[in-house]
Curated annotation (Swiss-Prot):
The active site is at H117 (pros-phosphohistidine intermediate). SMART domains: NDK. GO terms for molecular function: ATP binding; metal ion binding; nucleoside diphosphate kinase activity. The keyword Transmembrane helix does not apply. The gene is ndk. Keywords: ATP-binding, Cytoplasm, Kinase, Magnesium, Metal-binding, Nucleotide metabolism, Nucleotide-binding, Phosphoprotein, Transferase. It catalyses: a 2'-deoxyribonucleoside 5'-diphosphate + ATP = a 2'-deoxyribonucleoside 5'-triphosphate + ADP; a ribonucleoside 5'-diphosphate + ATP = a ribonucleoside 5'-triphosphate + ADP. It comes from Ruegeria pomeroyi (strain ATCC 700808 / DSM 15171 / DSS-3) (Silicibacter pomeroyi). This is Nucleoside diphosphate kinase. Homotetramer. ATP binds at K11, F59, R87, T93, R104, N114. It is found in: Cytoplasm. The keyword Nucleotide-binding applies.
Amino acid sequence: MALERTFSIIKPDATRRNLTGKINAKFEEAGLRIVAQKRIHMTKEQAGVFYGVHAERPFYDELCEFMSSAPVVVQVLEGENAIAKNREVMGATNPADAAPGTIRAEFAESVGENSVHGSDAPETAAVEIAYFFSGIELVG
C-alpha cells in the first residue's frame, strides 16, 4: 500500500445544493485526509485549460460552461492508494451505474452533472494539483 495524493473537485451541481460537507464526510469516512481545499469560481478559460485533454470531444464546450457556472471546491486528498480509493468513493461517471453509497449514486443529477471529479492516475493527479495549488498550500 502506498500513501498517495489525489486531486478532487466538488462540482457546481453539488456546491449549488450545499453538499460540500456531505461529500467531504464520504472522503473522510473512506480514510482520505483533506490536506488542501479552497472554494473558487473558475472562469471558462481556466476550465478550458484544465479540461484541455478533452478539447476535441463533443462535450468539451458544455463541460467548460458547466464548470464555470458556479463555485467549485478544489481539494487534495491524501491516503493509502488515494487515487483508487477516491475513484471508488466517487462511483461510476454515470450515476445510474454507480454503486449504492457512492457520491455519484447519492448526489449526482446526471452524467454531466455528476457532483465530483477525481484524478485517474498519479501523473494526472500531479498536474491537476499543481494547476490549483502551490506546494506551501499542501498541509499534510
